[in-house]
Each structure stands twice: as structure tokens, then as C-alpha cells.
Amino acid sequence: MEYNKKIVTDLTDLKGKKVILRCDFNVPINKTSGEITDYTRIDAALQTINYLLDKGVKLIVLSHLSRVKTLEDISSGKKSLKVVHKALKNRLLGKTVLFEENNRNKDLPKIIDGMEEGSLLLLENTRYADVNEKGEVVKLESKNDPSLGKFWASLADIFVNDAFGTSHRAHASNVGIAKNIKESAIGFLVNKELAKLSKAVVNPRKPVVAIFGGAKVSDKVPSIKNIGKFADKILIGGGMAFIFLKAKGFEIGKSLYEDDQLELTKELLSEFGNKIVLPVDAVVADSIKAAKGKRYDMEQFPADLAGFDVGKKTIKLFKKELKLAETVIWNGPLGVFENDAFNKGTLKVCKYIAKITAKKGCYSVIGGGDSAAAAAKCGVTHSFSHISTGGGASLEFFSGVELPGVACIKNKGEEGKVEAVKEKTTTTTESASKEKSSTAKTASKPATSKTTAAKKPAEKKPAAKKPAAKK
């Protein structure tokens, strides 16, 4: 799939413009300390952020953080972007980095008008809009509520999507904004992701070897079908391997599998059977939490145990298939990666892919998630050609479907237009203004700032200060 989307460098006359930027700051946070444990996603967004700030825009940044399902999720502060605000301030020294606790504050237009050129305003977690003041799950963000997308779009002149990790979702903070704004573009990160992933699937260097792992085959079927069209080999591991083995008549003991996917799995074997390579042995145990497992050939698989990793014979077989590969696409671990007793297959295959990438120039792509975590654990992250920042997004990309968060962006040369959106009786901002700040910890009126806000002249009256976000 080829892309001709506007990128941030195609935008002109940016000085003084208001730009709303969707980032993916869904970072891991230590539950005890409340500190961020991996800054990769924040650092990945800095190129676009710095580019826009250096152009003199007023930058409004949106992101989600985890899922928000209850008022407790909001009031506890555990899913607040305040910790991200702190990280951004530390990385954007010398630049004004503000934070607004209410991402639907009716005074946001005034706050943004009062911002200095080249400053940034981070709005609170977009998914706070998924729960209303009564604690009801309304999913205004996650289900792309028209009024919410229109409100956020009204805050800016231009929309930039640089959140690849959420581009497979049609949310109010990406598709909803893009439909209601005249000019839009993708950021450096999304552009890089599209280019790197495309290289693996559009006229890739042959032979192509794809590796699929993880627990559920249902998550991978569309990608297997699409990649199966051009891949030379498809290596199957992880929990999903057992449904393939069962479909071929092997004993899999108490290994979990999706019974409703059995017929579909048989169809995959029928269509791509000459390409699919399955485990020939497995490491089994009586529990996923077992301290150690025992290896069995598939022909001798015990009926009273379950498989949690590929065995040494399978690792050797997979390495043999990978040896001649010029392109490798990997999505999903080959075992229960979280347990050291069952991570050998994932780690050894990971190191081998890194080795052939470094030694013979194989083009290797990891589709994020646990596979990326495996590369980090092995210390070979920089040995891969590309490690995606979006597990779900990369998987959908591999299925051949255009991502909603990319499809909504204007193409190069396309004239700006705004799609008509039917108004609701109660607007999103009106709803937000009714929320109790004591429960949701959002500002029902503009937050105060330690910095002086710009003054708006008024006829025959003293100048009134504009609302300002917290610094």
C-alpha cells in the first residue's frame, strides 16, 4: 500500500498558527512510585514537537494513557498525563510547556489565544472523556463522538497525527478532529512507521519469512492471510501454534486454543500449508506459573499438561528457515515471555534475527508489543531494521488495511474541506462543564498559572487577563 499523505514538512506559514498534535504517550508507569519506566514513546514524539515549536506555532498536544473505565480511574490520578507533562518539561528546556486538567474546558479557546508562539499546552488524558460525571462509561473519545471531535478541532488551525500506536482506531482525537479541520498532516514518527513497514510488505526483498506468535490466532488471521500472499515461509509459535497443531491432528494436552477458530485455522493450513512451519516440540508444564518445564516432541505430547514455549528442536528449525531470509516480519512471542521458564524460544530466535540483520543485511521488522520487549531484554534493539511503536497498529497494517488514523489525513495537493457533522442537543463542552471537579479532578473553570497571561483589551475598561493553563 502506497501513501501520499501530507507530512508536517509540507505545512507552510506556520508561525502563529494553532496546531493540535495527537501523540501516543501511553507509557508504562510503575504502580508503586508512579514514575514512568520507559520513555521511548515520549522521546519518539520529540522530533515533531520540536519542529513545530521551532516554527513558532501554538501547540496543543493530545494523548491517552491506559483505559479509563471508572471515576476512580480519574480521581486517583493514576492515569493522569501530569507525569508526562513533567517529562516533557525536562526534555523541552527553555520552552514553555503548560498543562490543562480539563481537556473539554469551555475556556480552552481563550487559554490558547493567550499562549506565546513556540509554546506547548498538553491537555489531560483524552480517555477521561470516556466516563461521565455519573460514572457511566460513555466512550466519547473511544467511539469518536462527533461533538468531541468537533470541539477539539475548533481549538486549532491544523491537525497533525503523530500517534502511530492509535492509528488503527477511529477515535475523536484523531479521525474526529481530522474530519472537522481544513488542514492536516502526519508527523515524522507516523511517516517513518509507514515507510519502514511498507518496505517489508511492498515489493520486499526475497525470501520473506514471517513469524507469528502470541496467544490468539484470531488476532493474527487477517495478517497471515495478507502476508501469506507474498511470504516464502510463515513460522508459527506461541499459544496460537496449538490450534494449528490440533487442526493437523496432534495431541496438545491441556494447551489453550480458540475452539471457534478451528475451522478457520484449517482453512489457513489448506491455503498456506506449504509455507506454514509449526513447532516440532514444546516445553510443557502443569501451570503457566511453573518454575520450570519439560521438553517433549509433539508426537509424545502429554495429555495432562499444557505447552508454554517452543522446544530446542523448533528453535533450530526456525533458525534454519530464517538463515536465508532477506526480509523478516515478526509479531508476537513464541512462548509465555513473562515467565523466565518459558522465554527461551522467544529470546533465542530474537537474537538470531538480530544476528542475520547485522551480519548479512537482512531487513527485519518487529511489530511492537512483547516482541519489542524481547529485543530490549536481549539488548539487541538497535540491531533490528525497525521496531514499531504500535503493536495493534502494525498488525492491522500487515493485514493490508489502511489505518483510520492515516486515511483521515489529507493527501498532498488535496484542498482542505470540513465534513458536516450533525450537532447534538447537548454539546461536549456543556457536558464537561457540568462534571464535578472534586470527583474528576478537572477544572470547571480555567486553571491559574504562575506565568502572566496575555491581556485582551476591552473598551473603556481595565484590561482583563485571559485564562491560562498551569505551567
UniProtKB/Swiss-Prot annotation:
Q: Pathway of this protein?
A: Carbohydrate degradation; glycolysis; pyruvate from D-glyceraldehyde 3-phosphate: step 2/5
**Which ranges does the record mark as transmembrane?**
none
Q: Which Gene3D superfamilies match?
A: Phosphoglycerate kinase, N-terminal domain
Q: Which Pfam family name is an example for this entry?
A: PGK
Query: What is this enzyme's EC?
Result: 2.7.2.3
Q: Where in the cell is it found?
A: Cytoplasm
Presence of keyword Flavoprotein: no
Q: What's the domain of life for this entry? A: Bacteria
Q: Where does ATP bind?
A: 220, 307, 338, 368-371
Name the keywords, alphabetized: ATP-binding, Cytoplasm, Glycolysis, Kinase, Nucleotide-binding, Transferase
GO process annotations (BP) = gluconeogenesis; glycolytic process
Ranges of biased composition (kind: Low complexity): 439-455
- GO CC term, one of those recorded: cytosol
Q: What is its main location?
A: cytoplasm
List the catalysed reactions: (2R)-3-phosphoglycerate + ATP = (2R)-3-phospho-glyceroyl phosphate + ADP
What segment(s) does the record annotate as region Disordered?
417-471
What does the record give under GO molecular function?
Answer: ADP binding; ATP binding; phosphoglycerate kinase activity
The protein's assembly and partners = Monomer.
| Annotated family | Belongs to the phosphoglycerate kinase family.
Q: What is this protein called?
A: Phosphoglycerate kinase
Q: Which organism is it from?
A: Malacoplasma penetrans (strain HF-2) (Mycoplasma penetrans)
Which gene is the coding source of this polypeptide chain? pgk
